[in-house]
Amino acid sequence: MNESQFIEALRAEGFELSETQLSQFKRYFEMLVEWNEKMNLTAITDREEVYLKHFYDSLSAAFHFDFTKVETVCDVGAGAGFPSLPLKILFPHLHVTIIDSLNKRITFLNELALALGLEGVAFHHGRAEEFGKNKKFREQFDVVTARAVARMTVLAEYCLPLAKVGGSFVALKAAKVSDEMADAKNALAVLGGKEKATHQFLLPGEMSERNIVVVDKLRKTPGKYPRKAGTPAKEPLI
């Protein structure tokens, strides 16, 4: 996906990119490739692949969830900033908090935000399980996002404790998500959530399946969740 195709694909979904936004995406790509030589941020470094598999893929969440109606977003395990920083570029009003367990990625994100002139962003080094217990973060966000971090049974325990009651958890998943969602039904209920919708689509060009899963946070998450760091992955809620 070259830049023109990127512009057209977003236009088809009702989003018109400004010159400022286009230059932010260009600089994002340049810094991603530059920093990737020093640290392992991504296996995808070809310009057209980055625009498709990182930028467009991240923004696809906005085709199925209205980010104009929310203010605070927490992105769990964002790595090099996906999906929340492309969403921040598209929706500058968002206040974005990223939690990532690797400190070197936080260093990159701080430099990136500076270079792109992004305000209203905060990057924290640590585990989602720790932040879910912290009163400053627990049930404080309108939306919690995650892309390709873990299976839904695990991901729900990372993310739902951070979403406020009445808020949402938006997961960006690859193919065959229906089995995951069936397995996660009880975990979502235990943690105070319920699946609202799963939107399936094909990534343009390569036509690989993607899914945007939207979960409503209906009730407070019981105090014992999330469990201590490492437990959700080892012993998923079923």
UniProtKB/Swiss-Prot annotation:
<feature type="binding site">
    <location>
        <position position="82"/>
    </location>
    <ligand>
        <name>S-adenosyl-L-methionine</name>
    </ligand>
</feature>
<comment type="function">
    <text>Specifically methylates the N7 position of guanine in position 535 of 16S rRNA.</text>
</comment>
<dbReference type="InterPro" id="IPR029063">
    <property type="entry name" value="SAM-dependent_MTases_sf"/>
</dbReference>
<dbReference type="InterPro" id="IPR003682">
    <property type="entry name" value="rRNA_ssu_MeTfrase_G"/>
</dbReference>
<dbReference type="Pfam" id="PF02527">
    <property type="entry name" value="GidB"/>
</dbReference>
<comment type="similarity">
    <text>Belongs to the methyltransferase superfamily. RNA methyltransferase RsmG family.</text>
</comment>
<keyword id="KW-0963">Cytoplasm</keyword>
<dbReference type="GO" id="GO:0005829">
    <property type="term" value="C:cytosol"/>
</dbReference>
<keyword id="KW-0698">rRNA processing</keyword>
<feature type="binding site">
    <location>
        <position position="147"/>
    </location>
    <ligand>
        <name>S-adenosyl-L-methionine</name>
    </ligand>
</feature>
<keyword id="KW-0949">S-adenosyl-L-methionine</keyword>
<protein>
    <recommendedName>
        <fullName>Ribosomal RNA small subunit methyltransferase G</fullName>
        <ecNumber>2.1.1.-</ecNumber>
    </recommendedName>
</protein>
<dbReference type="GO" id="GO:0070043">
    <property type="term" value="F:rRNA (guanine-N7-)-methyltransferase activity"/>
</dbReference>
<feature type="binding site">
    <location>
        <position position="77"/>
    </location>
    <ligand>
        <name>S-adenosyl-L-methionine</name>
    </ligand>
</feature>
<keyword id="KW-0489">Methyltransferase</keyword>
<keyword id="KW-0808">Transferase</keyword>
<feature type="binding site">
    <location>
        <begin position="128"/>
        <end position="129"/>
    </location>
    <ligand>
        <name>S-adenosyl-L-methionine</name>
    </ligand>
</feature>
